[in-house]
Amino acid sequence: MINKLIEKIQKTGAPIVVGLDPMMKFVPDHIRKAAFEEKGETLEGAAEAIWLYNKGIIDKTYDLIPAVKPQIAMYEQFGIPGLMAFKKTVDYCKEKDLVVIGDIKRGDIGSTSAAYAVAHLGKVQVGSSLCAGFDEDFVTVNPYLGSDGVQPFIDVCKEEKKGIFILVKTSNPSSGEFQDRLLSTGVTAGTDAENVGGIAFSDKPLYEIVGEKVAEWSGQFMGDKGYSYIGAVVGATYPEQGKILRKVMPKSFILVPGYGAQGGTGKDLIHFFDDNRLGAIVNSSRGIIAAYQNEKYSKFGARNYADASRQAVIDMITDIDQAFQTIGK
């Protein structure tokens, strides 16, 4: 699947992913009204509204982009009907030949981690049949529990030729509370360095140590185009850390959240990529799906919300392209 993602990026010239993170406050009144008239002001009505909203955006942008990234929590809040809308969205995007990155951020161990992996990437045994669950192409994974949590996902990826993006340096403001903590390397934590003869050691931030582990994992499952099926999540809001991690994880594709509404711009992104404009894919969610609520795109109005989303995609592609041109890439 990493091969397909790269091919789609090359075909579209757009190293971007649209985050399908619907909130009811983003859904135009006419869509909410139609959904509620059919199914009432219920969880079913809300799920129908976000599905119709998503479909409109997909229909207007699928020819411009390689991938989408639905955030499952935005669907889970509407219970089982919301999860059905999530699945419907995944399936529709795949019909449009888009790569689907399920933003699920799962993290557990053993059989539980394996069950998460099967639910979203693999197939479950049901009697004599093998049945796919949500069936995304990639998912995001939380590595806090270590290899016990990540390896089951890698195993399913190998079986299904799918991939994962592991959280390394996230875009949120408080990420540094843990991810930037300095840890001693080269000696066991707590050891008196003066008593360790001839061993060099230094302090590294936790995100860099996680990045080194991702680089190790990535070697287990390489694609045909120089990149692994095992990628990383690194926020656009931390470009200097991104520059470091690009070197630490040379074979891992980087999923880059934080563009647009969170403050990231095209010029913040250039060091996430290799010299061929590959190696990263940049996410924008509400900056695209709720573009019509932005003054810049207000001329489109709520009725033409999806046209506003299309224009926001075009503007994002242009912004990133101009950033590349400034450094001759």
Predicted feature descriptions by range:
Residues 1-60, 300:
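N-terminal glycine-rich anion-binding loop in soluble enzyme alpha/beta folds
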Residues 12-16, 63-66, 96-98, 134-137, ...:
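Short, well-ordered coil/turn segments that N-cap beta-strands
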Residues 18, 68, 103, 139, ...:
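Conserved, mostly hydrophobic/aromatic
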Residues 58-64, 92-95, 154-160, 246-249, ...:
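Acidic (Asp/Glu)-rich catalytic clusters
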Residues 64-66, 70-132, 241:
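N-terminal active-site wall of soluble small-molecule enzyme domains
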Residues 108-230:
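Conserved anion-binding
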Residues 236-283, 287-294:
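A C-terminal functional module that forms or caps the active site or interfaces directly
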Residues 269-275, 290-329:
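C-terminal helical cap(s) of enzyme catalytic domains, especially alpha/beta-barrels
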